[in-house]
Amino acid sequence: MSVPAEVVEKARKLREEIEFHNVRYYRLDDPLITDAEYDRLMAELLAIEARYPELVTPDSPTQRVGAPPVEAFTEVRHEVPMLSLENAFSEEDLTAFDRRVRKELSRDTLEYVAEPKLDGLAVNLLYQDGVLVRAATRGDGEVGEDVTHNVRAVRAIPLRLKGEDFPDRFEARGEVFMPKRGFLALNERARRSGEKTFVNPRNAAAGSLRQLDARVTASRPLSFYAYGIGAFPDARLPATQHELLESLQRWGLPVSPEYRVVRGAAGCLEYYRSLGERRHDLPYDIDGVVYKVDDLKAQAGLGFVSRAPRWAIAHKFPAEEARTRVVGIDVQVGRTGVLTPVARLEPVFVGGVTVTNATLHNADEIRRKDVRPGDTVIVRRAGDVIPEIVRVVPELRKPGAEPFRMPEVCPECGSAVEAEPGEVLARCSGGLYCPAQHKESIKHFASRRAMDIEGLGDKLVDQLVGRKLIATVADLYRLDLDRLAGLDRMGEKSAANLLAALERSKRTTLARFLYALGIRDVGEVTAKVLSEHFGSLEALMEATEEELLAVADVGPVVSRHIRLFFAQPHNREVISQLLACGVSWEKPAPAPRKLPLQGLVFVLTGTLASMSRDEARARLEALGAKCTGSVSRNTSFVVAGSEPGSKLDKASELGVPVLDEKGFLDLLERGRP
């Protein structure tokens, strides 16, 4: 029958597209599509050629294994072709493979060697008289690249074999890969040095092995597992694949500790499921399982098709990377007020589930990856890890795509967003009002060191918020017996006890109240200092930056947090409601007689001849001064004895007055500066 013109054109386009991606993957180590997308393209072309055999051409990607080697390396022609494997994407595919093999061998059941499919770079190692003499990459399966100088730098690969029972000349084959821990450390070093990071361990392994300078390869955390042989004298072949692996291991070539001999399709699937459950606990990346007929004579009888052995198959795990489009970027507010950008994605099946969102972590991460709404991106999902965007495909970005900017106000409550210089996290400042922070702000408000509301535990707060009985801390004081008694495990007695505890908590101190508000960086000590310094809530709420900086222990950052918190109308409204509900405290007692050095901050450095540092500190504190361990713009004087440290330099830098020992003694005698 004649082939429809549209099918001929489709096959031509598929061949061109697959060849293009072969070059990107094998020659440039810079793939534009995921393995799953590549497999789909190849499967589509195979299906067309199976239906219309006349469309098969000598240069079709289905008739070869990969792309030609790069020109920077010497070419090596493999004595035995390094073929790729057919893929099984489902249990049905694997069962069909087992059925076909058993039929061709006329056997009721077969044993297979099952082992992890490592995600690295395949290499062929030639040993003569037990010494490694040549190493080559797979290349296009027929011709690879000579990487002997680099493979010698991979510590897991022996330069000389162990024992004496190995053949005089043979080839071992295996996978060079980069363990997860080494990959993370390598990328961290690259980030610190401002260098380009690798997308995944496979790219890192390939890039490391194909360096012209072997010293670079030696610095990379590469490893190796052998999985088979190339050229090998027939007379020395063992009977089975697993005995061959045992021989390789005995000669010093590492093999996967995860390989097993399994029986039939059922044994293969049991191994596949078991390894799939543990794959993320393994120290290296895998993307499936390889099954090989264990009987080597049976392997020889089954032979090969044009691009793969008929006695082996790769059973792929669901793809963990996929390509999709960013529909938009939303900003979520966490329970502590941290703003996290999240990419909304066109639904894509990856890692066994359909993914519609991916975390972008923070503004710095968005800038580093340059993710923009409308971008085409590669998404990764590994196990239970939240899906993340690995990288953007810049070639597919539409003109005029605008960079994303974090909002200046909270998307949940409209309060101002604060982000300190040097910090990657942005936070909502509407702690008392923001719906996203309700539970945490209420739990903190009720805690023992804050308002000390006995009986109001975390689970009860979850119930109250979940049933919409309370939304802010002020709502606690509007609860009644009927609503409380209707909660889980809350009878009338427990409800009455909680109401009594709420009533008691209304009588507090200004320091406790300030701490209970949950102002960022205002802990118990700072709250106490603020209450003593300002004396009233009103004075603190209206304090200027200069007035706040005059308070000991309050620097520019804490001052900014305090002013921003009280500047939010929502926070002020909740505070007004709390006061209207009866929360109160006694006015601070009149300040005691002012001491001569009260309000002054001293820093001691060096050694004093006339007294110890503890004695000097005690003398200063007796006159009302405060002694601290570091110099800041709030420091009034630095007292410098002999052999002063870096504090003296800091004082000079900030313009803080310095007293020598004589000046210090004069000050103590006068009792004033």
From Swiss-Prot:
BRCT domain ranges (all copies): 592-673
Chain residues that bind NAD(+): D35, A36, E37, Y38, D39, S84, L85, E115, R138, E175, K292, K316
Single Gene Ontology BP annotation: DNA repair
Keywords, ordered alphabetically: DNA damage, DNA repair, DNA replication, Ligase, Magnesium, Manganese, Metal-binding, NAD, Zinc
CC cofactor: Mg(2+); Mn(2+)
The UniProt record lists the keyword Metal-binding: yes
Molecular function via GO: DNA binding; DNA ligase (NAD+) activity; metal ion binding
Residues the record marks as active site: K117
InterPro entries registered for this protein in UniProt: BRCT_dom, BRCT_dom_sf, DisA/LigA_HHH, DNA_ligase, DNA_ligase_AS, DNA_ligase_CS, DNAligase_adenylation, DNAligase_N
Transmembrane domains' residue ranges: none
Recorded catalytic activity of this chain's protein: NAD(+) + (deoxyribonucleotide)n-3'-hydroxyl + 5'-phospho-(deoxyribonucleotide)m = (deoxyribonucleotide)n+m + AMP + beta-nicotinamide D-nucleotide
Record EC number: 6.5.1.2
GO CC aspect terms: cytosol
Known function: DNA ligase that catalyzes the formation of phosphodiester linkages between 5'-phosphoryl and 3'-hydroxyl groups in double-stranded DNA using NAD as a coenzyme and as the energy source for the reaction. It is essential for DNA replication and repair of damaged DNA.
UniProt-recorded name of the protein: DNA ligase
Species in which this protein is naturally found: Methylococcus capsulatus (strain ATCC 33009 / NCIMB 11132 / Bath)
Gene name tied to this protein: ligA
